[in-house]
């Protein structure tokens, strides 16, 4: 390790203490079941309402939210598995494009997002 005046290329220094991810953002916990026959992996920044249609949960709770896990990580749901996950609200301009094409704009268009999910056979849509 280098002294305090120089940093060796590739070196990093870690501060003391814990890092709280998504500090100050609203969080909620939901139960999710994998009703499919294959494992499903969901990345840290995926708009949760748009995840694989074989995951069963209250899709309305997933609108405008993502997994509350460190950036670059993922949660894995094995077939038949049910587990609780914590979601946190999306930041930025709260617009989502692509993924499963349920949103393609503002996450505030909740009725339209749920209508598309229902039409496409997503589980967990009332």
Curated annotation (Swiss-Prot):
CDD domains the record matches: Urease_beta
Catalytic reactions on record: urea + 2 H2O + H(+) = hydrogencarbonate + 2 NH4(+)
Cellular component aspect of the GO annotation: urease complex
InterPro entries, alphabetized: Urease_beta-like, Urease_betasu_sf, Urease_subunit
First-level EC class: hydrolase
Sequence similarity: Belongs to the urease beta subunit family.
Subunit structure and binding partners: Heterotrimer of UreA (gamma), UreB (beta) and UreC (alpha) subunits. Three heterotrimers associate to form the active enzyme.
NCBIfam families on file: PRK13203.1, urease_beta
Protein name (record): Urease subunit beta
Annotated source species: Sporosarcina pasteurii
């Amino acid at each position: 390790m280098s002294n305090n005046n120089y940093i060796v290329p590739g070196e990093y220094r870690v501060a003391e203490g814990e890092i709280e991810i998504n500090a100050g953002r609203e969080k909620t916990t939901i139960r999710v079941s994998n009703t499919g026959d294959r494992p499903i992996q969901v990345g840290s920044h995926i708009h949760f309402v748009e995840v694989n249609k074989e995951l069963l949960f209250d899709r309305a709770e997933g609108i405008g939210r993502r997994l509350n896990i460190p950036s670059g990580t993922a949660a894995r749901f094995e077939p038949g598995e049910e587990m609780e996950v914590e979601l946190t609200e999306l930041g930025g301009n709260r617009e989502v494009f692509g993924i499963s094409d349920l949103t393609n704009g503002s996450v505030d268009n909740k009725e339209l997002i749920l209508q598309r999910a229902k039409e496409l056979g997503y589980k967990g849509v009332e």
